C-alpha cells in the first residue's frame, strides 16, 4: 500500500475529513517521526510498535558492476520492532487469508 492508497482508504472509511486534511495529517506525522529519529530519539506507539536507530558497523562491500572492494562507512539505519498486538493481529489475519 502506498501513502496515496492509505490516504484514500482513511477518507473512505471515516468520511469526516477531506482528502487534503488526511494527507496533511499523515505527512505531518511522518515528518515529525523522521525528525525524532534524526535526533536519535526512539518512538513508541503502544500496541503498534517502536522505531529506533541501529548502528551498522563499517565494512568492506563490493561494487556489483566492477567486483572491486569498497570500504563502506558505519551508519545508523531506522529499525521497526512490531508490538505484540500488531504481531498477534497479523498472525490472526494470516490464518484467515492464506
Swiss-Prot record:
Tell me which family the UniProt entry assigns to this protein: Belongs to the bacterial histone-like protein family.
Q: Does the keyword Cytoplasm apply?
A: no
Pfam families named in the record: Bac_DNA_binding
Q: Does the keyword Cell wall biogenesis/degradation apply?
A: no
The identity of this protein, by name, is Integration host factor subunit beta
GO MF terms here are: DNA binding; structural constituent of chromatin
Q: Which organism is it from?
A: Pseudomonas putida (strain W619)
Q: What does this protein do?
A: This protein is one of the two subunits of integration host factor, a specific DNA-binding protein that functions in genetic recombination as well as in transcriptional and translational control.
Alphabetical list of HAMAP family matching this protein: IHF_beta (MF_00381)
GO biological process: any one?
Answer: DNA recombination
